[in-house]
Structures are given as structure tokens and as C-alpha cells.
Amino acid sequence: MQCHARGHLVYAGRGVLSVHTERGTSIVPANRVAWTPAGFTHCHGAHGNTDMRVVFLPASLARLVPGHPAVFMVSGLAREILLTLTGPRNDDRAARDYDRAALARLRRVLVDELHEAHEQPLRLPAPRDDRLQAIAQMLYESPADNTSLAELGRAIGASARTLSRLFHNELGMTFYEWRTQLRIYHALILLADGHDTTHVAHACGWANPSHFIAAFTKLVGTTPGRHRT
């Protein structure tokens, strides 16, 4: 785990990246960018054949983006700026061709582009309550588990009503929404590792691949097949 004095953007030019903080996990498929504000302890994960680019923002620009971890769709212009700021070899050599004022302008345009983009529903919030943590651990280890919330509650000594309230109050979503987010996160990793759609659907708890495709498309914005290509 690491922590920076400046906020930073992590761009997935290829493959799937993940950014883990105390708030949860940001899932970063290709052509998305994750924002981590200054002061957040975090670590990155890479899955498949990845191309990770990192751009730090000064405090003057960081104030213009959310104060919490977030994931954004990357426009064509934002993508070109990210690649320019990091260079073809993913270092800062290309950026040396620009003076400081030009680099500042590029970063400002990048932030403007993020303002125009909507936050993506690709964050898996981390529970704080011990009971939710126990359920989360079980589902992390077995994302295909279709056990109901009531059955999971009996295993840890909590009612389904109590757990539903905790999911809503702590994580801002229902249990089924959270589990779907978790499954899509695992699906993105499996797709990045080269598995086909049917295998991924079954491995992540969908008996019917068409239902998996619909859930995946709703969250990621493209079908699993198109995402793989």
C-alpha cells in the first residue's frame, strides 16, 4: 500500500486495472480512468495484458474533481492528453517536449474533460460492519455463490432485514446490487485473462449467459465480447 501527497489518475489503455483504497475497489477497464485523491492509502492491480498510465494533478486542479475515489469514461481528447503526458514508453520523456505552461494547460483540459464525463458505476465499496465484512469475504472467495441474503444471515447470526439495512446505509446499494458489482469485477478479470463469455458467466454465478451479458453491458457500457476485443 502507498499514499501520495497529490491526487492521481490511473488510466487503463489496455487490459483491466484495479485501485484498492480503504473506501473499496475501483474497477478500471480499458479506456476508463480512476481518480484517487491525495492522502488515500491505496494499491494498484493489473489483470491481463495491461497498459497503465499515471498522471498526478496539482492541488489547484485536484480541487475541481471529486474528493472521493471515482472512475470516469475517457473521451478521445482525454485519452490523447493522458498518452501525451505519459509518452509512448509510459514515462515522462515525451512530456519534456512541452514547457511547464503547456503541460499545465493540458492537465487543465484533462480535468475539464472529466467534468463532462459521468462517474462510472465501477466502484465496489468496502463494508465496515463486521457482519457485512464476513459476507463480503465469503462472496469474494466464491463469486458464483447464489446463497440468498437470508441464508447468509443465518450463517453469521444476523437477520436479512438487518443486513439489508446495513447494505443500504453503509454502501448505498442493495445486497443484490453489491453482489452484481462484485461479480462484474471478477468477470472483467477473467475476460482479461482470456476466458470466453460462457465460462465467465458460469464462473461468476449466471446460469444463463444472456443474463450475464445484460448485467455486464449495463455496468460496463459494452458487451463482454466487444470488451475482449
Where are these regions (language model features)?
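Short helix-to-turn junction characteristic of helix-turn-helix DNA-binding domains
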Residues: L85, L139-P143, L190-G194
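Short hydrophobic/aromatic patch on the recognition helix
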Residues: N31, L163, F167, H211-F212, ...
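Alpha-helical residues within the helix-turn-helix
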Residues: R154, R165, N169, H202-A203, ...
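Short, Lys/Arg-enriched, Trp-marked, Pro/Gly-tolerant hinge/linker segments that flank
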Residues: H68, D91-I156, N169-Q181
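…primarily DNA-binding HTH/wHTH and HhH modules…
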Residues: I213-T229
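Terminal helix-turn-helix DNA-binding modules in bacterial transcription factors
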Residues: N146-A150, N169-I213, T229
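N-terminal regulatory/effector-sensing and dimerization cores
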Residues: M1-V71
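Aromatic/histidine-rich interaction motifs
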Residues: P66-T84, R93
